[in-house]
């Protein structure tokens, strides 16, 4: 994407591109007659994932591709399985984009390990923006499982 130098315009363009990507992916799934659930973000129950007495694993750099779900049911409506945003996530998403554009150091996301990856507890917009920017990894506080 060609950057204009105007942070708000760049953020708006990036968000539009990300939401178009989500719509295209949904259309492709419909044309292939795949169930809609395939595109939905998995929702995990934190109580089932976290065991009593477990210790946090600390802050680690984790692959974005390993993030496979969320702990918040409401976030599953704002993002698809690939963390592409819905149009309702715009304002916050653009603020995160602008912060990264300006070089701000954002706090690590919070995740809980799942069977094969991680579920996001906090930082859904940061994950979405990082993916839209083409990042391969993200700093995360890995909570006890």
Set out the residue ranges of the language-model regions.
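Long, charge-dense
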Residues: 140-145
């Amino acid at each position: 994407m060609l950057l204009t130098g105007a942070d708000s315009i760049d953020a708006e363009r990036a968000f539009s591109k990300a939401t178009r990507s989500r719509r295209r992916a949904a259309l492709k799934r419909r044309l292939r007659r795949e169930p809609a659930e395939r595109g939905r973000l998995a929702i995990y129950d934190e109580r089932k994932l976290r065991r009593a007495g477990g210790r946090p694993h600390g802050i680690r750099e984790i692959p974005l591709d390993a993030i496979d779900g969320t702990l918040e049911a409401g976030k599953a409506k704002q993002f698809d399985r690939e963390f592409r945003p819905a149009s309702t996530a715009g304002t916050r998403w653009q603020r995160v984009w602008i912060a990264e554009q300006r070089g701000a150091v954002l706090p690590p996301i919070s995740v809980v390990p799942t069977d094969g990856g991680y579920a996001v507890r906090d930082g859904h917009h940061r994950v979405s923006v990082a993916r839209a920017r083409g990042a391969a990894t993200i700093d995360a506080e890995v909570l006890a499982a």
